[in-house]
């Protein structure tokens, strides 16, 4: 049976849920899809809550590890929704997930208020350039004291303000559990709160202006083999557009390879073309599963080149922001997280700079052990032992 065609009728927006583990991100994601399925059944499939927590060991631990993508529509827009992991060891995925957001719903339990990971996620959202955050104050059904809810709300607004987000953003009081379960007390009230949340998302998160006129580039997040058809790479198109049967290059990590895209899919529907902002799978002609890997990019031939040496401007996180406790010196070898992968690099501080302290804004040279598809202005995170210790941008390519 031929797959359905993807219809591009409404503006497309990428959003996601971020926040502390156990504050109800995945439950809220399920509640949103259920409420929208009931309101607009023609355009919204029914998702199973257990589908979102996609790996079996997560279900056992009750935590979301892989980033789960679902799609849904409001009256105004088509959304792709990533349910981001809440656990500190999965911050790396958070970076790949959050980088794909045009806006985020910060989920905070009214019973707890902002916790360590709430702060870390807001900080990461700022680092990776999420433009807008609004708040779902969850578990309001478990707090009788309205004043307590208002105190938590004030605390969340302060946290957003401290990290450069709008403190006057919409804050919706909700209960994801109450909206998800038909027999929950005040079910209708909580269903309405989820509708209010999505109205706020429609109005508050701006429709992104995607870079359609720039040369095509898609960072590879995952690689699959489809038997009898070939190798598929998936990711979110960063810029430009691409039609079926167009030649492309695979750039970074290894020597640059030429291939042709023979099929394009999104959410299991085939497309004639994809464009900036689409979550897409590309079928590559003549390449095997082991010829491509996460961290490479698919790009218009000649538009981007691989480099190993650059000068960067970096903000080094303080201890309180989850960064290092001590300074670093020349020859420090952390990982540099570009788009979808970590590459080890050696730092060389400029002459006259002996060390860089947590909290510093620094400029230094980096030499990577593998080439990355790189341009001036490209952002990266500096990571060490699984923790983000800095964020920066490439100011000058040296080699």
UniProtKB/Swiss-Prot annotation:
Residues 83-86 are annotated as: G3. Its main location: cytoplasm. One of its GO terms (molecular function) is GTP binding. Residues 10-209 form the tr-type G domain. It is found in: Cytoplasm. One of its GO terms (cellular component) is cytosol. The keyword Ribosomal protein does not apply. SUPFAM superfamilies: EF-Tu/eEF-1alpha/eIF2-gamma C-terminal domain, P-loop containing nucleoside triphosphate hydrolases, Translation proteins. Residues 175-177 are annotated as: G5. Monomer. Belongs to the TRAFAC class translation factor GTPase superfamily. Classic translation factor GTPase family. EF-Tu/EF-1A subfamily. This is Elongation factor Tu. It comes from Bifidobacterium longum (strain NCC 2705).
């Amino acid at each position: 049976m031929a797959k359905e065609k993807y219809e591009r009728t409404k503006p497309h927006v990428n959003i996601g849920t971020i926040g502390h583990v156990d504050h109800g991100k995945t439950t809220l994601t399920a509640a949103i899809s259920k409420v929208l399925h009931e309101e607009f059944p023609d355009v919204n499939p029914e998702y199973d809550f257990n589908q979102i927590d996609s790996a079996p060991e997560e279900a056992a631990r009750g935590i979301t590890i892989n980033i789960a993508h679902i799609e849904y529509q409001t009256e105004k827009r088509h959304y792709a929704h990533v349910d981001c992991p809440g656990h500190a060891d999965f911050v790396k995925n958070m970076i790949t997930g959050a980088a794909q957001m045009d806006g985020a719903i910060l989920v905070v339990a009214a019973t707890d208020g902002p916790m360590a990971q709430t702060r870390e996620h807001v900080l990461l959202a700022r680092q990776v350039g999420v433009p807008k955050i609004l708040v779902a104050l969850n578990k309001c059904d478990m707090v009788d004291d309205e004043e307590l809810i208002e105190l938590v709300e004030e605390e969340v607004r302060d946290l957003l303000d401290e990290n450069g987000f709008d403190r006057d953003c919409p804050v919706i009081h909700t209960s994801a559990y109450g909206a998800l379960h038909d027999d929950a007390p005040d079910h209708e009230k909580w269903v309405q709160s989820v509708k209010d949340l999505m109205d706020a998302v429609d109005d508050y998160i701006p429709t992104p202006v995607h870079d359609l006129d720039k040369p095509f580039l898609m960072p590879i997040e995952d690689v699959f083999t489809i038997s009898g058809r070939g190798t598929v790479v998936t990711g979110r198109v960063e810029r430009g557009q691409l039609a079926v049967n167009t030649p492309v290059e695979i750039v970074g990590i290894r020597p640059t390879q030429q291939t042709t895209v023979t099929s394009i899919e999104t959410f299991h529907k085939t497309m004639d073309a994809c464009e900036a902002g689409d979550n897409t799978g590309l079928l590559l002609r003549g390449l095997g599963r082991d010829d491509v890997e996460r961290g490479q990019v698919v790009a218009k031939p000649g538009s981007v080149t691989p480099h190993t040496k650059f000068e960067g401007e970096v903000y080094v996180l303080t201890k309180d922001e989850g960064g290092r406790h001590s300074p670093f010196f020349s020859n420090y070898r952390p990982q540099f997280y570009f788009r979808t992968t970590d590459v080890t690099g050696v730092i060389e501080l400029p002459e006259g700079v002996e060390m860089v302290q947590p909290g510093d804004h620094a400029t230094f040279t980096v030499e990577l052990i593998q080439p990355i598809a790189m341009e001036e202005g490209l952002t990266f995170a500096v990571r060490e032992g699984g923790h983000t210790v800095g964020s920066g941008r490439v100011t000058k390519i040296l080699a």
